[in-house]
Amino acid sequence: MTYCYVCPHRCGVDRAETMNSPNGIFGSCGCGMQPIVARAALHMWEEPCISGTKGSGTVFFSGCNLHCAFCQNYEISCLNKGQEISVERLKEIYFDLIKQGAHNINLVTATHFTEAIIASLQEPLPVPVIYNTSGFETVDTIHRLKNKIQIWLPDLKYSDDLAAIKYSNAPNYFNTATTAIKTMYKQVGPYQIDENGLLKSGVIIRHLLLPNMLENTLRVIDWIADNFEPGQVLFSLMHQYIPCGRAAEYLSLIHISEPTRH
């Protein structure tokens, strides 16, 4: 890949140049082609069918194609803090986590490193691979990951496109994300859970309840109910919002979500 069109921003920049030159042109993600990893560890606080009893082998990639004002991982996703590594080292990280007992390998915000992800998964892993994403994906990128990802874990952040632009710089987010989610489902089909209650394959749609945006949430729920039958996808409604990142710049985002609304 010379010019990058891997995400819906379709920046068209030469990300190889950003790696090798301080004067390179940065796209929306602000990263070069080599993967940058901020943290890799067993994570016990994902959904129970993902974390299980031993943890999810979570790899947090630096940078992001969204820049959500309220991001809880702001230093990682927006300030790109982390260490640049090779594809070979990335594969080693997968197996280090598996040796520690990881039920799966959980790739967090990996879209801008799709080339490296594909290269690192040329040989199947002995555990499911999870693609943990903002939902702001292209159909082409999802197709390229076919047979490499067993579990899709997309956010469906917004049904309100004005809010998506305001808080995440994501034009046409709702149509883009819902099209992506339908494509993910076509790829892996209805979710499958093993005898230990762990997810083997399928789609979990996440949605974070944002302050003062209850209608946004209700429209997300309506879309899922209208487009999927019971037993096809899982839905994770989250209420752990706290003002992080640049949330203080927006009066509407400085409140903590009310558990009663959840």
Q: Positions of the model-derived regions?
A:
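N-terminal presequences and immediately downstream first alpha-helices
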Residues: 1-28
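Electropositive phosphate-/nucleotide-binding environments in soluble metabolic enzymes
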Residues: 1, 5, 10, 62, ...
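Conserved small/polar residues in nucleotide/adenosyl-binding loops
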Residues: 254-262
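Conserved Radical SAM active-site core
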Residues: 19, 23-152, 160-162
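Short, acidic Gly/Pro/Ser/Thr-rich loop/turn segments
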Residues: 12-14, 36, 66-69, 212, ...
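Twin-arginine (Tat) signal peptide motif
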Residues: 64, 182, 260-261
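Conserved AdoMet/S-adenosylmethionine-binding subsite of the radical SAM
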Residues: 92-251
